[in-house]
Structure formats: structure tokens, C-alpha cells
Curated annotation (Swiss-Prot):
Keywords: Acetylation, Cytoplasm, Metal-binding, Phosphoprotein, Transferase, Ubl conjugation pathway, Zinc, Zinc-finger. This is E3 ubiquitin-protein ligase MARCHF7. Residues 1-43, 69-136, 158-281, 296-342, 361-430, 445-475, 512-533 are annotated as: Disordered. E3 ubiquitin-protein ligase which may specifically enhance the E2 activity of HIP2. E3 ubiquitin ligases accept ubiquitin from an E2 ubiquitin-conjugating enzyme in the form of a thioester and then directly transfer the ubiquitin to targeted substrates. May be involved in T-cell proliferation by regulating LIF secretion. May play a role in lysosome homeostasis. Promotes 'Lys-6', 'Lys-11' and 'Lys-63'-linked mixed polyubiquitination on ATG14 leading to the inhibition of autophagy by impairing the interaction between ATG14 and STX7. It comes from the Eukaryota. One of its GO terms (cellular component) is cytosol. The RING-CH-type zinc finger domain is required for E3 ligase activity. The gene is Marchf7. It comes from Mus musculus (Mouse). The modification Phosphothreonine is found at T688.
């Protein structure tokens, strides 16, 4: 990952390849130091691979000035010789690093030196600066470890324990941030005075550096360089016996050679952080997979799945646990990491192959163990602490529940002592197939969907049918004896049925049998006998002739004159069958029109010919009837309005009294009674005035 351009210093591990221009150390100091190191069993062998490297071909050559043999104190040399023989296998590994782009510091004059990422500064080192050679034995390591522990509290803001590179797992990967602990191999820097320099009075390992220069190379394009390691190169670089050196720049540009990292102490921390990150990643993947599988796919809920759940909770060992254990036992390269991630992805998204396993179970018997393994893994993954099994059982889909109930019922019926009976099924080609109901029909996995559907749809049936000879199913329709249901199975694509087969169930009458079913078309077809059609036509003609013989009919009741008191009259100019009407029928019609609230003109006008009615009816005055009805309507309206006014007045009085605060219930009741009496007296006066007129 790319580091942020902020306060976190970066350390760039440099391994010069063949393409980079390397330069042998020249001068008496370098040769004498090389000779002294080669004489000590090649403890600090300065080969051309691990000496200074330039960033580009056009850059200035990197010529580091090493110490001369005379400048190294005799005590340090003797101590190093004795310690080196004892601790030859524990030689530290140092890498050339460059602290880049850091601008942190609590005080104004303190902090890390800001060094350009593209080039190194080429400057003279002050006389007060010193270069400490930090690989003279375990006593010097112990003293520096004590110094690190003292200064952990003051530089805790620059620490990042959890950072690790995602590309390299060996000790020489490119680290973007500066770790703080000694096991990580870096040295924290506080202020202008380097905190990693040892005092001359306590260690006597400081070396004069009057004429030393910091090697640097400045490119015209200011392009930074970084060394990219492959996993094998990094592994060989870690196991190599050649030590590297790390340069740390502080505010006063004091170069210090220190022990950069120790692989044996660094490995447990890095592996623990890697395992923790992988464990959280696997946990997230398993949660996503289980949630998506429980949401989008219906589980196969049966007795087998219940047993599988109990077995998987006891005996199932997750491959992820085995993978994490194997990675804890030894170091892993980047190829192992990529293989582990591929395995994690296949485990996390195995729910995508879950439905494939279930469908292959219904198509082929040989794939049943693989489908059971998928079911075990999904059940073991779903039994996490974040979603309990009881809650998932309550959220079982409806169709899965129905399928489970059908299987339970079919298993109970198959175990019961029921004699085998023959059922009659009809294929779509109208050929009758006789099937024997076997008690062990549930043993075949291909017949599970049909058995469950038939037993759930026909609850009163005896047993479940079985497919004939395991061939193609063109579609079956049949009836279970002793039941009122008829089911039909659609044709399947293969020799067996899938889980999502839809079975059609019809309710049939009690007196239905197979022969009636065959004669359905004959009975449903209408009879086209010409003799019956002729008889119908003759009866219709006779009715028409009878109507003609009856003569005139009333246009309201469609009957002839029955008595002399109810004769047929011609009220208007209508002709034909609408010409005549009974007197009583006409009176009823006119009365209905008056009661409906029609006007006098509308009552005395014919609705068909729009002519005025010419009526001479006994005891029937249209004008008088219309006026009486109008008076009644006015009285009704007056009473309705009066009652409305009384109620409105009462409400207004009550609200007024409430507002004035003088609400007295007896007085209000008396006033209401007086108002009602006044209204009744007014109504009596109106009635007397109408009688006078």
C-alpha cells in the first residue's frame, strides 16, 4: 500500500541488483576493514552486493568512507572477536534504509530530519558526529535494548505496531512505517541528538569521524528508487550471512550504523499479526457467506439436515483452523499466502455451489456424499454466535417447511402396516399405467420430491406412487383411492425430478370414478339433435300466435282487460303495443311520480310521446294530489329546519354560558323545554291556518 505523505517515516530496504551500478570500497580504510572482517570468519563481509548502490547510471558514484583499522578501539575489536566466535549463528542483519519525508517533532528544534525521497543529501558530517558500529556482540545488543525500553514512552506517537506489508512475509520486505520495538529492527529517533548513540564513558565504542562523508547521489530527474524483492530473493536475503547496514539521518545529519532487525525475534510478532488479520478476514467472509446463503437460498429442511447439524457441531473441523495452525508452526512465503487466500475465498463463497450440490443430488446418486459435505460446511458455518440455530429454524421458508412436513408424513405412512394397493394414473398420452405403492418408495432420492408433494397434497391417501422404470416422465395425473384429491405432475426435463416440482391438486366430487372421467367430453358436449331444435321453434311460434289472438295488452302490466272496472284506456298518442294501459295501472304510475317530487307538468306529460295526458279517471284528481304532497313536503322541511334551529340554539346557549361562566343545568333545561313548547304551539297554529283555507 502507498503510505500517506505525512509524519510517518519510511524505511526502504535496498538490495542492489546487477542492473544497479555498484562500486567497490576504495581507500585504505575500506580495505583494512574488509581484511579485518574476512579474518574473522567472514562475519561482516562487505561484498559488492551489499555495499552502497546508486539510484541511476547518471548519478554520482556512491563512495562511502569506512573506518580504518587504526581508528577502531582495541577493546571493541577484542570484544567483537571473542563474541563473534560464540555467536556466529546469531549475526544481525542490517538493511540500508532511508528515512524520508518526516516532519514531526514536539519542540521547534527537535524532530526527525526531513530528507527528500528522490535523493540523499550529500553533506559533510560535523566533527561532533560519530558512527557507531552496532554489531559487536550481545552485550551491546542488551545495552541498546535497555535504551529502547527507556524511550518507548517518549516516542509512542511514532509507533505503529499493527502495520505490516501485504506483499512480503519475509524479514526483508519493504516496510512503509518505522516500527518501534527492538524486534522490528528499527531505532526510534527523538531530537537533534541521536538517542541511539552510546556514551563513550559507558561503552567506549564511539569512533572519530572527522573526515567522513555521507554517500549520496542526486539524479537530475529526482527520481526515487526502491528495491522490489521476490519472495525467493527475500528469503535468501534473510538467510544470507552477509550483514547489511542501515543509515539513519537525524536533525544534525549524524549518520549512525545500528542493528536494523533480527529475524528470530521479528518472526513471532509478524506471524501473530498476519494470523490475526487473516482470522478477522475469514470471520467476515464466513459471516457474509452464511447471511447470503440464509437469505437467498432455502435450506433443505429434513431429518437428514437435522442429523447433519448435530454431527457437524460435534465432529466437523474447519479447514480454516487447520490452515491457521500450519501457518503458526512455520514461516510461510508469499506463494503460500496466495494459496491460502484462494482457499479462503473458495471456503467463504462455497454457498454459491450449495444449490449445485443439492441439484446434483437429485440427478445423480454418486454425488450425494459431496452434497452432504456442502450441507455440513454450510451448517457448521451458519452455527456461528451471531445467529443462533433456533432463530434460523424459526425463519425457515414456507415451502421448505411444507416439504419437511410432507416427508415426515410420508415416512410415517411408509412405516405403517398398509397393504400395497394399485393406483391408476393417466399419462398425457391417455394411456393408463398401473403402479404398485411400495413401502420403501422413499429410499430412492429421485422420488423424494414426488413423494413429498403427493403425501402433502393428498393427506387422506394410502401411500405414495413411484416412477415407472426410472425413465422419462411425460407427466402423470392420477387419483389416490379413498381421497377427494386429484393431482397432476408436469413432465420433467430428465429422468428424475428436481426439488421445485409443482404438483396440481384438484377437488373432485364424491361420485366420480375413472369411467366418468373418460366420458367427461361426451357429457359436456351439447346435444345437437335436429328434432329437439324443431320442437323448440314450434313452441316459440305457438306462443307468438297466442299473443296475437289475445288482442290489446296493457303497456305496464302486459295483460288484457280482466274486468269492467279496470278497462284499457288510451292516455296519449302512443301507438302499437304502448297504446293501451289499465286505469289502475295508470293511477299507480301517476301517484309514484307525484311522490317522487316531480313537478305537475312532468306528472301530466307522457314520457314516450311527450304529449299531455288526457285522463278522465274516477276519484283521482292529479292537481289535488300534487298540492297535498307539496304541503306535506313543506311541513317536513319546516320541522326539520325547526329542529335544526333548536339544536343550534341550544348549542349556542351552552357555549355562551360556558364562556360567561354562568352554567346552571336546571335553568338551561327549563329554557330548552320552553323553546320546545313555543315551537309546538307554532306548529299547531300552522295546522289550523291550513284547515281554514
Amino acid at each position: 500500500m502507498e503510505s500517506k505523505p505525512s509524519r510517518i517515516p519510511r524505511r526502504i530496504s535496498v538490495q542492489p541488483s546487477g542492473s544497479l551500478s555498484t562500486r567497490m570500497v576504495s581507500g585504505n580504510r575500506g580495505t583494512s576493514l574488509n581484511d579485518s572482517y574476512h579474518s574473522r570468519d567472514s562475519s561482516f563481509r562487505l561484498d559488492s552486493e551489499y555495499q552502497s548502490a546508486s539510484a541511476s547510471a547518471c548519478a554520482s558514484p556512491c563512495q562511502p568512507a569506512w573506518y580504518s583499522e587504526s581508528e577502531i578501539p582495541q577493546g571493541a575489536r577484542a570484544r567483537a572477536q571473542t563474541q563473534q566466535r560464540d555467536h556466529d549463528s546469531k549475526r544481525p542483519k542490517l538493511s540500508c534504509t532511508n528515512c524520508a519525508s518526516t516532519s514531526a517533532g514536539r519542540n521547534g528544534g527537535s524532530g526527525l530530519n526531513t530528507v527528500s525521497d528522490s535523493s540523499w543529501r550529500h553533506s559533510q558530517v560535523p566533527r561532533s558526529s560519530s558512527m557507531v558500529l552496532g554489531s559487536f556482540g550481545t552485550d551491546l545488543m542488551r545495552e541498546r535494548r535497555d535504551l529502547d525500553r527507556r524511550r518507548e514512552s517518549s516516542i509512542s506517537n511514532l509507533m505503529d505496531y499493527n502495520h505490516r506489508s501485504g506483499d512480503f512475509t519475509t524479514s526483508s520486505y519493504v516496510q512503509e512505517r518505522v516500527p518501534s520495538s527492538y524486534s522490528q529492527g528499527a531505532r526510534p529517533k527523538e531530537n537533534a541528538v541521536s538517542t541511539l548513540q552510546l556514551n563513550s564513558s559507558s561503552t567506549n565504542h564511539q569512533l572519530p569521524s572527522d573526515h567522513q562523508t555521507v554517500p549520496s547521489s542526486r539524479d537530475s530527474s529526482r527520481s526515487s528508487f526502491r528495491s522490489h524483492f521476490s519472495p525467493r530473493q527475500s528469503e535468501s536475503f534473510r538467510n544470507s550471512s552477509h550483514p547489511a547496514f542501515s543509515y539513519f539521518s537525524s536533525r544534525n545529519e549524524t549518520p549512525t550504523i545500528s542493528n536494523s532487525e533480527r529475524g528470530s525475534s521479528q518472526r513471532p510478532y509478524r506471524e501473530s499479526s498476519d494470523n490475526e488479520g487473516r482470522r478477522t478476514t475469514r470471520r467476515l467472509l464466513s459471516r457474509i457467506a452464511s447471511s447470503m446463503s440464509s437469505t437467498f437460498f432455502s435450506r433443505r429442511s429434513s431429518q437428514d439436515s437435522l442429523n447433519t447439524r448435530s454431527l457437524s457441531s460435534e465432529n466437523y473441523i474447519s479447514p480454516r483452523t487447520l490452515t491457521s495452525q500450519s501457518r503458526n508452526n512455520g514461516t510461510s512465503s508469499s506463494s503460500d499466502v496466495s494459496e491460502g487466500r484462494a482457499a479462503e475465498a473458495s471456503q467463504g463463497f462455497r454457498f454459491l455451489r450449495r444449490r449445485w450440490g443439492l441439484s446434483s443430488l437429485s440427478q445423480n446418486h454418486s454425488s450425494e456424499p459431496e452434497a452432504e459435505n456442502f450441507n455440513q460446511e454450510s451448517e457448521g458455518r451458519n452455527s456461528g454466535p451471531w445467529l443462533s440455530s433456533s432463530l434460523r429454524n424459526r425463519c425457515t421458508p414456507l415451502f421448505s417447511r411444507r416439504r419437511r412436513e410432507g416427508r415426515d408424513e410420508s415416512s410415517r405412512m411408509s412405516t405403517s402396516d398398509v397393504p400395497p394397493r394399485s393406483h391408476i394414473f393417466r399419462r398425457d398420452s391417455n394411456e393408463v399405467v398401473h403402479l404398485e405403492a411400495q413401502g420403501d418408495s422413499l429410499g430412492a432420492a429421485a422420488n423424494r420430491p414426488q413423494a413429498s408433494g403427493a403425501s402433502s397434497s393428498a393427506a387422506a391417501g394410502g401411500s405414495t406412487p413411484e416412477l415407472p422404470q426410472g425413465g422419462r416422465n411425460p407427466g402423470l395425473t392420477g387419483i389416490l383411492p379413498g381421497s377427494l384429491f386429484r393431482f397432476a405432475v408436469p413432465p420433467a426435463l430428465g429422468s428424475n425430478l428436481a426439488d421445485n416440482v409443482m404438483i396440481t391438486v384438484d377437488i373432485i366430487p364424491s361420485g366420480w370414478n375413472s369411467t366418468d372421467g373418460k366420458n367427461d367430453k361426451a357429457k359436456s358436449a351439447p346435444s345437437r339433435d335436429p328434432e329437439k331444435l324443431q320442437k323448440i321453434k314450434e313452441s316459440l311460434l305457438l306462443e307468438d300466435s297466442d299473443d296475437e289472438e289475445e288482442g290489446d295488452l296493457c303497456r305496464i302490466c302486459q295483460m288484457a282487460a280482466a274486468s269492467s272496472s279496470n278497462l284499457l284506456i288510451e292516455p296519449c298518442k302512443c301507438t302499437g303495443s304502448l297504446q293501451y294501459v289499465h286505469q289502475e295501472c295508470m293511477k299507480k304510475w301517476l301517484q309514484a311520480k307525484i311522490n317522487s317530487g316531480s313537478s305537475l307538468e312532468a306528472v301530466t306529460t307522457c314520457e314516450l310521446c311527450k304529449e299531455k295526458l288526457q285522463l278522465n279517471l274516477e276519484d283521482f284528481d292529479i292537481h289535488e294530489l300534487h298540492r297535498a304532497h307539496a304541503n306535506e313536503q313543506a311541513e317536513y322541511e319546516f320541522i326539520s329546519s325547526g329542529l335544526y334551529l333548536v339544536v343550534l340554539l341550544h348549542l349556542c346557549e351552552q357555549s355562551f354560558s360556558d364562556m360567561m361562566g354562568n352554567t346552571i343545568e336546571p335553568s338551561t333545561r327549563v329554557r330548552f323545554i320552553n323553546l320546545a313548547r313555543t315551537l309546538q304551539a307554532h306548529m299547531e297554529d300552522l295546522e289550523t291556518s291550513e284547515d281554514e283555507f
